[in-house]
Regions:
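Ligand-binding pockets and gating/stacking loops
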Residues: 1-94
Length: 94
């Protein structure tokens, strides 16, 4: 995964981090081949179709690994934390 980059070049002739649009490539392991999910506006600044949170991508990967959505992990003082926060993106599954 690549953190998104600003649609416009900055004053230093580079691009800064941009959390609104980014790309990710997945292959095998239960991912539908050739799938493209989501769409951005013409300047690649904001999503226009199927916006999702990175937690949904993590949930998709956990699902493919067989990790249950109600899995809890515990920190060093035994406080429970949900491992899976998002929801799997069903359209990416084979």
């Amino acid at each position: 995964a690549e953190f998104g980059r600003t649609p416009k070049i900055n004053t230093n002739q580079g691009r800064d981090h941009w959390p609104f649009v980014y790309s990710l490539a997945l292959a095998g392991g239960g991912i539908q081949g050739g799938a493209v999910y989501g769409k951005s506006d013409k300047s690649a600044a904001y999503p226009t179709e199927n916006p999702r949170d990175p937690a949904d991508m993590a949930a998709t990967i956990y699902h493919l690994l067989g990790i249950q959505s109600d899995t809890r992990i515990y920190d060093n003082i035994q406080r429970p934390h949900s491992l899976v926060i998002g929801s799997p993106i069903e359209e990416l599954l084979a």
